[in-house]
Design a protein with these regions (language model features):
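Long, histidine/aromatic-enriched segments associated with O2/redox biology
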Residues: 1-201
Length: 201
């Protein structure tokens, strides 16, 4: 298995995340749409070689079992977490991550996948994302400072090892989305914001 192109590089300026369930889409149709996405990506890479075009496609445990006869160890649906912050779980079949230096390229690749199948899938979430200044989150703080910065360190953190056998260099994806109350946040003084960030991190 080869690491998918979006897994190891540093983030691009734009990205698109798609989470969906199959409704009336057959497995063969899904494979056709994935091929359309990948062929569009490859064509755009040829046309725009400097625009950092990268993708990853992941499958949920239920769909995986229909696609493949073997399953990576510990690959399962997560359980909801409850505590200071609730972390619900929304089971999905397909997760698509598209990244590029350009938003229009991300959109074009996503449309190649959706072409003709919109009524056959349930889109649970679709997000067009952008780099905010120098990699800050929406609260204005630099996020992800604990993430590995060097290629070897990122590979160690993100890829399955040789002990995974045929799945070595594959990855598990945990997709999370946070909602910020920016109106309330902006009423806080800077020192209070900094303290609040420390309590969360």
């Amino acid at each position: 298995m080869t690491a998918q192109s979006v897994i190891l590089p540093l983030p691009s300026d734009h990205a698109r995340f798609i989470v969906l369930r199959l409704k009336d889409l057959s497995i063969s149709e899904l494979k056709q749409q994935i091929e359309a996405l990948l062929s569009t990506r490859d064509r755009l890479i040829t046309q725009h070689p400097n625009d950092q075009i990268k993708t990853a496609i992941a499958f949920g445990p239920e769909l995986w079992s229909k696609l493949y006869s073997q399953t990576p160890e510990d690959f399962r649906q997560l359980d909801p977490q409850h505590g200071a912050f609730d972390m619900p779980v929304v089971p999905a079949d397909v997760f698509i991550h598209i990244a590029s230096a350009r938003a229009d390229i991300c959109f074009a690749i996503s449309q190649a996948f959706f072409n003709g199948i919109q009524s056959k899938v349930d889109v649970l979430d679709e997000r067009a994302c952008f780099r905010f200044f120098d990699g800050r989150d929406m609260t204005g703080f630099i996020d992800g400072t604990e993430n590995p910065q060097f290629p070897d360190d990122r590979a160690e953190a993100a890829l399955l090892t040789e002990t995974a056998g045929a799945f070595a260099d594959g990855s598990f994806i945990f997709a999370q989305r946070y909602i910020h109350n920016l109106a309330k946040w902006q009423q806080l003084k800077v020192d209070a914001q900094e303290q609040d960030r420390k309590s969360v991190v």
